[in-house]
Structure formats: structure tokens, C-alpha cells
Amino acid sequence: MTKVFCKKYHQELDAIPFQPLPGELGKKIHNEISNKAWQAWLAHQTILINEYRLNLIEPKAKEFLKEEMYKFLFEGKEEKPEQFSEI
């Protein structure tokens, strides 16, 4: 499997086997983010969708997730919703 130096975890890890999004952001994620970080984002994204009851048909919800994804993957910011508690 191909390796990348992951911007989130600051180490060389397995790459995502595909470009997860179209466009420049998708290329950036594919080239700079590991599969481990991408899987962590998918889990975090699920929390955000459920806790904020996001409707993914709405452009505003999609933009919110895109901003949160960038913060999570490239800026190291992983803020969970205030009302969220892990069981």
C-alpha cells in the first residue's frame, strides 16, 4: 500500500486508496492525509451530523461539514458538540 506523510498525525502512514472528494481539496486530502485520519474524520463527521441533526441536502450543512473537515484534518481541531457524550 502507498504511504503518505499524514498532516494530521505527523507520521508516515497508509494512504487513502482513492481520492475521497472531487477537485483540489480532494487531491490535497489524497496526497496529505492518511487512511487512518480519513477514517477518524468519517467517525467524527457522523457525530456532527447526528448531534447537530444536519440535513445533507441543504448547502449550508454541506459547507459546515467541509469547514469542519478542513479544521479536523489540517488544523488539528476536533471539537465535539457541547451536548455530545460518549457511552
UniProtKB/Swiss-Prot annotation:
One of its GO terms (cellular component) is cytosol. The keyword Iron applies. The keyword Hydrolase does not apply. One of its GO terms (molecular function) is iron ion binding. It comes from the Bacteria. One of its GO terms (biological process) is cellular response to oxidative stress. InterPro entries: Fe_traffick_prot_YggX, Fe_traffick_prot_YggX_sf. Belongs to the Fe(2+)-trafficking protein family. Could be a mediator in iron transactions between iron acquisition and iron-requiring processes, such as synthesis and/or repair of Fe-S clusters in biosynthetic enzymes. This is Probable Fe(2+)-trafficking protein.
